[in-house]
């Protein structure tokens, strides 16, 4: 997904109603976020912010190097993401240390960007919204749901990961039932793009209404 454009809503005003968009790997979060964006909704994506935070010269990258060693860098001095992913998914302790470095910074930046918006509502894409127990940063939680078998098929086709790597990622995320229990709203992404589009448009109208109620 391209970097979000905040115009024309990047002006001080009443704070936007915040919808937290989450779901497991391969559930279709980026596609749903893109549809919301095409409907004119500002989207703030945690993964995009995370990539910005670990660019060369950023304090977060320096702290990661201090924690993991310089072997975590590639030849150009940037973060070797594949090596980092391997390390954190084979060590719970290293995963926890990485999260302690990145999560507070990501959430702080998401909050900062959200306060600049005057749109009726915005979407905060947070893959680990349920896991980090920070639901209070959003007004409503929208979960993208996908059956387990379809999820594994899509991830394997998209990311070219081994079954072992996929299982490690899934273990690091909340079980499907836990995500669904935390949801205020659910989009089921198990058919085609047209069906997905209709579901997003339905919730778009719902969130416009909820945002108007909050502002009154």
Curated annotation (Swiss-Prot):
A GO biological process held by the record: coenzyme A biosynthetic process
Q: What EC identifiers does the entry list?
A: 2.7.1.24
Localization, UniProt: Cytoplasm
The UniProt entry lists the main location of this chain as cytoplasm
> Domain of life, per the record?
Bacteria
Q: Kindly list the positions annotated as binding ATP.
A: 26-31
Q: Which CDD domains match?
A: DPCK
Query: Which parts of the sequence belong to the DPCK domain?
Result: 18-214
Q: What does this protein do?
A: Catalyzes the phosphorylation of the 3'-hydroxyl group of dephosphocoenzyme A to form coenzyme A.
SUPFAM superfamilies named in the record: P-loop containing nucleoside triphosphate hydrolases
| Pathway(s) the chain acts in | Cofactor biosynthesis; coenzyme A biosynthesis; CoA from (R)-pantothenate: step 5/5
What family does the Swiss-Prot or TrEMBL record give for this protein?
A: Belongs to the CoaE family.
Protein name (record): Dephospho-CoA kinase
GO MF annotation terms: ATP binding; dephospho-CoA kinase activity
* Gene designation per UniProt: coaE
- The protein's organism comes out as Nitrosococcus oceani (strain ATCC 19707 / BCRC 17464 / JCM 30415 / NCIMB 11848 / C-107)
Q: Which UniProt keywords apply?
A: ATP-binding, Coenzyme A biosynthesis, Cytoplasm, Kinase, Nucleotide-binding, Transferase
Q: What is a single cellular component term in the Gene Ontology annotation? A: cytoplasm
- Quickly give the catalysed reaction: 3'-dephospho-CoA + ATP = ADP + CoA + H(+)
Against Gene3D superfamilies, the record matches this protein to: P-loop containing nucleotide triphosphate hydrolases
Taxonomy, top ranks, is: Bacteria, Pseudomonadati, Pseudomonadota, Gammaproteobacteria, Chromatiales
Write down the top EC class of this protein: transferase
